[in-house]
Amino acid sequence: MKNKLVLIDGNSVAYRAFFALPLLHNDKGIHTNAVYGFTMMLNKILAEEQPTHILVAFDAGKTTFRHETFQDYKGGRQQTPPELSEQFPLLRELLKAYRIPAYELDHYEADDIIGTMAARAEREGFAVKVISGDRDLTQLASPQVTVEITKKGITDIESYTPETVVEKYGLTPEQIVDLKGLMGDKSDNIPGVPGIGEKTAVKLLKQFGTVENVLASIDEIKGEKLKENLRQYRDLALLSKQLAAICRDAPVELTLDDIVYKGEDREKVVALFQELGFQSFLDKMAVQTDEGEKPLAGMDFAIADSVTDEMLADKAALVVEVVGDNYHHAPIVGIALANERGRFFLRPETALADPKFLAWLGDETKKKTMFDSKRAAVALKWKGIELRGVVFDLLLAAYLLDPAQAAGDVAAVAKMHQYEAVRSDEAVYGKGAKRTVPDEPTLAEHLVRKAAAIWALEEPLMDELRRNEQDRLLTELEQPLAGILANMEFTGVKVDTKRLEQMGAELTEQLQAVERRIYELAGQEFNINSPKQLGTVLFDKLQLPVLKKTKTGYSTSADVLEKLAPHHEIVEHILHYRQLGKLQSTYIEGLLKVVHPVTGKVHTMFNQALTQTGRLSSVEPNLQNIPIRLEEGRKIRQAFVPSEPDWLIFAADYSQIELRVLAHIAEDDNLIEAFRRGLDIHTKTAMDIFHVSEEDVTANMRRQAKAVNFGIVYGISDYGLAQNLNITRKEAAEFIERYFASFPGVKQYMDNIVQEAKQKGYVTTLLHRRRYLPDITSRNFNVRSFAERTAMNTPIQGSAADIIKKAMIDLSVRLREERLQARLLLQVHDELILEAPKEEIERLCRLVPEVMEQAVTLRVPLKVDYHYGPTWYDAK
C-alpha cells in the first residue's frame, strides 16, 4: 500500500472546533467543546484516509522568525479565549491516547512544520493530506499534496488540488504567496499594497505571474493610482510575499519514521472519553467492537417452569417483553422479575395462565418498578390482563432528568448512569426487518439483566429527581398519566370507514377537477407531483419569476409557491392540489390502513417521553395532526364517531392557555387584569399596539394582534413577525415595542429567563420540568438566538403541557368517583376528547370544565370551552 501522510494544523482545527460548537463542559466544569470537535475531525480522518503516517503540528509561541522581519506580524489578533486555552492540554492528552505525535518548533509556526514535512514526504513518494482552517496552506497543493480546508464546523471541508486552486482563485498554488504579497492578509496583519484587493491582485498575477514581475512591469500597468501605489509600496509587497511564504525547510527534528501511525491506545482513549463525558464517542466505540457480543459479568438467575411465591414479592422489578414497534399487536415473548430474593425468567404461556401471577400483576399493593410501563400495560390489556401497582418507571424518570436524551431502551439509560451489566435490545434482537427473537437462554438472560438494571437504578434516579425537586412530577403526574394513556390507547377511537371511503372518493373527484384546471392554465399535461416538470412549466413556459433554485433545478417548495401566487392563477390551484393530495394519502388512505379489523377503531400510541417541552405526541396514527385549517381537512373529523349507540363525542379545550400561563409567570399587571376582567385578549392587545378604542378595533387589527400575542410566546423576532403578517420589519419592530410598552412585565420576564438560563443551563416549568439549553452560551449568533427563544417559550409551553396532564389525571379520578361511563379518548394539545352516553352529557358540561379549570391555581382564571355532537367534527 502506498504511504499516506496526514498533517493536521492543530491550532487552526482547535479554533474552528471551539467556535463551531457550543460551550460544553464535563461534570468537573472543564470546557470540552474544542476537544470534542477535534475528536470528531480526527475520527473522520482516520476512518476515511487510513493514514500510514500522521502528525499534528502546533504553534510554539507568539514570536516567530517572521516577527524579526516584521514586528507587527499577526498584530491585532484577539486574545485566545480562556475557555479554549484550558483545552490545549486536553488536546495533547487526546493525541497521546490516539498515539498520534504532536510537534511544535520554537520560532516557527505550525504551517512551517507542515510545509517541511509535506516536502519531505513528497520526495519519498508519499501521498499527503493537509488539514487546516487556514487557506494560506493552499500554496502547498501539488500533484501529491491535497489541502483540505475546514468550512462550516470541522467536518465540512473543501479539498484543494492544483486544479481546484486554479479553479477557485484563477492562480496556481505557487502564486498564492504572490497574491498575499499584493493584497495582504488582514488575519495575519500582512500589509500588502494599499489599494489592491483580491480582484486587482489576481488580474495582475494572471498577466505578470509573480510579484517581482509585476514590480518590474509597472509601466505596462493601467491606472495611475495603482502604478503610484506599486512604486511607493514596492518593498512592502516583497516583504508581504516573504511573510506569506510557508517555510519548507524548517529544522524539524522528526523523521518520517517517527510519525508512523500505530493505532490508538484503546484503554487510554476510553478513560479519557469517560473523564471528558464523551458518551456518544464511547457508544460508537462499543458498537464498532460489536457490543452485542461483549462479555458481561455473570449473573445468577432461574428459568422457571412455574410461578412460585418467592417471585411474587411485595416489590419487584418487572419486565414484560414486547418485541415489535407497535405493541398493540406485537407478541409478549418473555417475562422477567428481579427482587431481593433473586432473578427469574418466566415463559409468557406459563406466567399469563397462572392465577397467582395474574393476581399479583393486578394487585395495587404489590409494587412494581418497570421501564415503559405503558407499553407493557397495553400489551397485557389485549390479553384481558390488568397491570397495577407501578411505583417507578425508569423510562419516565430518565426522561424527566434530561428530556433531550432519547432513552431507547434500558441499556441506554443504564449507560447514562454508569451501569454496564445489560446489553442493548438492538444487540440482542437486531433491528428493522432483521429483528428476531433469540434462543430461550439468550432471551432469558437479556430480560433478567434488564430487570436487574431497573431494580438497581430506581434508587439513584429517584435521589437525583429529589435533588431536582422532580420526584413528585414523576410519581404524581407522569406515572399516573401513563396508566391513563394506556387506557386511552386500548380503548381507541371508532372510525366510520364508509364515511372515510366516501370522503376519499369526493377528494379524488376534487383532485381531478383541480388537475384539469391546472392543465388548462398550463396549456399542456404534465406530472404535477414532479418538481422538475412543474418547474419547467412555471418558470420556462409561463415565465414566472425565479425566486430560488436547488441543486437539481427550480425550487417549487410551498413557501416559494405562496410568494408566486399573485403572479399567476395556476399557482393557487397547484397549492390546493398539494393540500388535497396530502389529505388523500396521509389522512384518508393512512387512517384506513390502521383501522383495527376487529374493533373498527384506531389505536394510537402516545409518546410520553419524547418532546423536550413535555407535550404528548402520537403515532400510528398521529391523531394530533388531523388538519383543521382546510375545510376538507376538518371534515375528516366527521369519520371519528362514538363506539356505542346513543353516545356522543364531547370535546373540551383550554382557551388561550399559553397566554394565561405567560400572564402568571411574567406577573404582568395589565395582562393579569385583562384576563381577570374576561376581556378578549387579542382585542385588548390590538387596542394597545394600534392606540385605538375597543369599538375601533377592526378584524384585521385583531388578527395582527393575535399574531403578536402568540409570536411573543415563542420569542418571535421582528423578522419573523414581518414574515407572518406580510409587513415590513420596521412595522413589526414597532408592534413588538408597543406590546412590551403595554405589558412591561412580559419584557422583564423574557430578559430574566434568558439570564437565568445562561446561569443555570436550564429552564423549568411550573411543576419543575426541566429543559437543558447547552447552546444558550454559543458564540454562533443563530444557534444562541434559537436557544434564547427556547428559554422564553419552554416554561410557557411546558407549563401548559403540565396543566393538561394534571387535568387528565383529575378528570379520570372524578369520572371514576362519580361512576360515569364517559371515557377519555384523545388529548390533542390543549383539547381533551371524550365519548359518553347522551344521558351523561349534561353532567359532563358541568364536570369537565370545572375539573380542567381547577387543575392548577394561577394568578389568572383558566377558561375551558366545550362542545359535543355525533362526531368529532360536530363537537366544535
Curated annotation (Swiss-Prot):
Its EC number is 2.7.7.7. It holds the Pfam family 5_3_exonuc. Residues 289-876 are annotated as: Subtilisin large fragment. It catalyses: DNA(n) + a 2'-deoxyribonucleoside 5'-triphosphate = DNA(n+1) + diphosphate. The keyword DNA damage applies. GO terms for biological process: DNA-templated DNA replication; double-strand break repair. It comes from the Bacteria. GO terms for molecular function: 3'-5' exonuclease activity; 5'-3' exonuclease activity; DNA binding; DNA-directed DNA polymerase activity. Optimum temperature is 65 degrees Celsius. Residues 1-310 form the 5'-3' exonuclease domain. Belongs to the DNA polymerase type-A family. Single-chain monomer with multiple functions. This is DNA polymerase I. It comes from Geobacillus stearothermophilus. The lineage of its organism: Bacteria, Bacillati, Bacillota, Bacilli, Bacillales.
